[in-house]
Amino acid sequence: MHPDAEETLRLILARLSDAKAEDTITIDLRGKTSIGDYMVVTSGRSHRHVGAVADHVLQDLQKAGVPGLRVEGMPHCDWVLIDAGDVIVHVFRPEVRAFYNLEKMWAPGRSAARRAG
């Protein structure tokens, strides 16, 4: 049996913390869209750090048995998207994150977003 959305979210947040991801926020998408229950947005310090963070998250999700994992952006590591079903993870380099500003689009005023940590 694979983990539910809350278990998947906890696993992702723990791994992001262990991997020293920065400025991690969680956006509650329930009732807003059918793409997932949660969105996690975080930053890595460099291309290499973004790739390493994403790799560690993927390994943990695979070990936990999360089905249907999809990943985009790994070769370049400016922005890596991990679709874990009910939880979507975006790992950015800081400049790319500032440019796309997903937090503003999905959680205006950050009322629906919470900082991890």
Predicted segments with their positions:
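Basic, polyanion-binding surface patches
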Residues: 67
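Long, contiguous binding/interaction regions
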Residues: 1-31, 45-52, 59, 64, ...
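A short, glycine/Asx- and small/polar-enriched loop/turn
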Residues: 33-37, 83-86
